[in-house]
Amino acid sequence: AAMVFSLFEGSLPSISKFGWRFLISDKWDPTQGSENYGALLFIVGTILTSVLALVIAIPLAFCTSLFVAEYFRGTKLASIVGTLVDLLAGIPSIIYGLWGFYILCPLVVEAGLSPQGFGIFTSALILAIMIVPYATSLSNTTIAMVPNDLKEAAYALGATRLEVIRTVILPNARSGMTASYILAFGRAIGETLAVTMLIGNENAIPHGLF
């Protein structure tokens, strides 16, 4: 509640000058005397890139967390993968943005998906890479907290590993994993620098992913 109040209080100057149309207008004219501003373009771009990034990141985070916390739990390989995932979370946004600019955009152009490589898809892909470590790390913790007694009981009844994952691990870890994806989505919404570098420089609502 305090955060909502703080945001509302900080937006009062904008609301008093431009009204609520600031949220639904796609005009952006900073010319002196005109001062016609609208945030719709930024809102749409943020929602599109964040949602698409989450769609890409969830399967990657889910599979990685199962790999680390269940299939190879306690092994050196799981430790290495877990360390690499944690390192990805510490890389600055500008590094991701530069990597996307110099590596990912040319790959998109070579694939014939976009003439310049910029767009919603490229931005969402970078965002997905950025939020996977957050979702994976929290999911690892949640899966590791599932009692071993439940899993051993399922194995004793003849369940396969896939059945144990489906009937024991997922039901017990669902709430924690969902929370991890929500936090990752919040991280995607709050990211600006890497997206600004890759989304393009067109002042218009996108009609496609490229």
Predicted regions and their residues:
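Transmembrane-helix boundary motif in ABC transporter permease subunits
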Residues: 53-85, 106
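Membrane-embedded alpha-helices of multi-pass transport/permease systems
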Residues: 5-8, 58-66, 95-98, 122, ...
